[in-house]
Amino acid sequence: YCAHGEASLDAAQALCEQGFEAYSLTGGYLAWLREELARQDDEQTRLRVETSLRKRFREKIWCNFTKAVRRYELVQPNDRIAVCISGGKDSMLMAKLFQELKLHNKYPFEVKFLVMDPGYSPANRQIIEGNLRRLGIEAEIFETDIFGSVYNVEKSPCYLCARMRRGYLYSFAQKLGCNKIALGHHYDDVIETILMGMLWGAQVQTMMPKLHSTNFPGMELIRPM
């Protein structure tokens, strides 16, 4: 299968000619995913996820999350934190963890959930909005043209895209009165960053759990995952 059910047509036909039983999904993987998500009950999905964080994944996920928050002092009284959601599983999980933290924390802090649309297709945008609704996350979505800006950049487009995304998130969060942004990078991302720096750049680079912004005074980046 493929995303839209077009590229997989020829592959399925070729496999059938070779004697295999092969099919191409009508509308592709995205159409199947939208249909599957539509069958799910939003309230039941939210409750199931929240219960799993409190019980099944309490030690593995929740306790490690709160341990990082305490150890690195990532959340302080009266903080206003912009939890940045890309639409992937890591940032969605982080958003649910912050919801739980706000319920059980000893001191007050505010949380804003942000989704930056860098130029997603309508299908991807619809999936992200649907997942937010199912998980009970009220997020503010703002649009940018980052994908269009880096489309023709031949050298290090991913680096430029990441830098631009970070800048937009800082700027929008600051306008909302936030003093921190939270990103969903985790331990695997740290290892990948170190290895990529060593293999491609002959240097050791890593990700810090918290980082003060140089371009946005008073803003701080935190990585509680």
Model-derived regions: residue spans:
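Short, structured coil segments at secondary-structure junctions
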Residues: 18-20, 135-136, 217
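Short active-site oxyanion
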Residues: 20, 179-180, 219-223
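Short, charged, surface-exposed secondary-structure boundary motifs
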Residues: 32-36, 150-151, 215-217
